[in-house]
Amino acid sequence: MSIFRFIDAEKASYPVAMLCRMLGVSKSGYYAWRTRPTSKRSREDVNLTERIREIHSRSRETYGYPRVHAELRLLGVRCGRRRVARLMRAAGLRGCMRGKKRRTTRRDPRAAPAPDLLRGNFVAGQPNRVWLADITYVPTQEGFLYLAIILDTHSRKVVGWSMDTHMRTELVVDALEMAIWRRKPSAGLVHHSDRGAQYTAISFGKRLAEIGIVPSMGRTGTALDNAMAESFIATLKTELVHRRRFPDREVARSAIFEYLEGFYNRRRLHSALSYQSPMSYEEATMEGAAVA
């Protein structure tokens, strides 16, 4: 902010003459600045800032300047990243900062885990090749709400989820059933998780086998072995859970549902997807496959 702009902002509280004297500028210089026509660049900055505010608001105030810049480009607005960053700083707009994920699942020492088939390689050229699963909890004033999710590694889309008051095996089975119903995967798809007791349970393994899904498991509590799912959980916590206080589980359930299905899958731009939403990225993949 320039000295003259600061004086203009504070003149309702302090005399202009005093402000000019304290800041070492002349009154005539201030009034000349006030009557000077606004530059084209300044007018453009004002208009661009309004567009930025709209995008930031639609993102639930979660987007930092890279995603805001990406959405501006999608809207046909040409401007540089540094300009967007500067205008966001001036407007007091910022994205969300991630916190640290806490361990949720616990390993059953009696269970025999499946081998790690991915070894940290989560790349899939098509949908329904590799799914990643994880569990987290959401605190409410009524108690914890537990959430199980399944991501498709190709698009980062949440293809299955389940919420309940417990984190027994039924929680992850329900998420799996949603993913199966939605996606109707072919045999050979890899389902990757950590070695938590819910995923090593006999009933869960049996359901995978019935569909022809191949289990893969990283080490429990080791983020790199299931990094993409862990990253999604961190995003959910940062952009929703840590910014709200939920009075009960039902309110939390509704908010999470709207975040997953109304925002994340459909609208949230993902840096790893060339700043497309998971749904848009999948649609582009399918269109490309149809043309080929």
Describe the role of every protein-language-model region.
Residues M1-A292:
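Charged DNA-binding/catalytic regions of mobile-element recombinases
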